[in-house]
Amino acid sequence: MSVSIQDFGKSTSGQTVKLATLKNDFIEVQLLSYAAIIHRIIVKDRKGNPVDVVLGYDTAADYELNTDSMGAAVGRFANRIAGAQFPLYEEIVHITPNQNGNCLHSGLHGFNHTMFDAALTPGETASVPMTATSPAGTDGSPGNFDLTIQNSLAKRGLV
């Protein structure tokens, strides 16, 4: 089993996008720090040839410029919030619309548009935690939201 992190490319704002690779005898998983994207999952087909089973793009800029969120973490929320508003306790929270007056997948600054911090974690599994924060007020959302996505690969498969 192995795990590594290397540079993948640059975002349109000039930030370095990292590529984390987790690998065992059966599977290779590649993850990007931009939007915690699952970039590739490579497994062997029935003839033993490696094949990538994930749809994706070749460059960091391609992921950033395409709005389909392919392979990306989605949040604070997923799906559509009608009218870009919702009740919270005794108030109506107004968030930024991004699709015909609605808010889809957390709007323009959701986790699918966020640079995550990626780190290596030693241990029995190949593991790469990715962390990001959505500060209070992001697209109108209340409160800070801290997210950690733990991507792990054991000796025989994904965890």
Task: Pin down the residues of each PLM region.
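Surface-exposed acidic/polar loop and edge beta-strand patches at domain peripheries
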Residues: 1-159
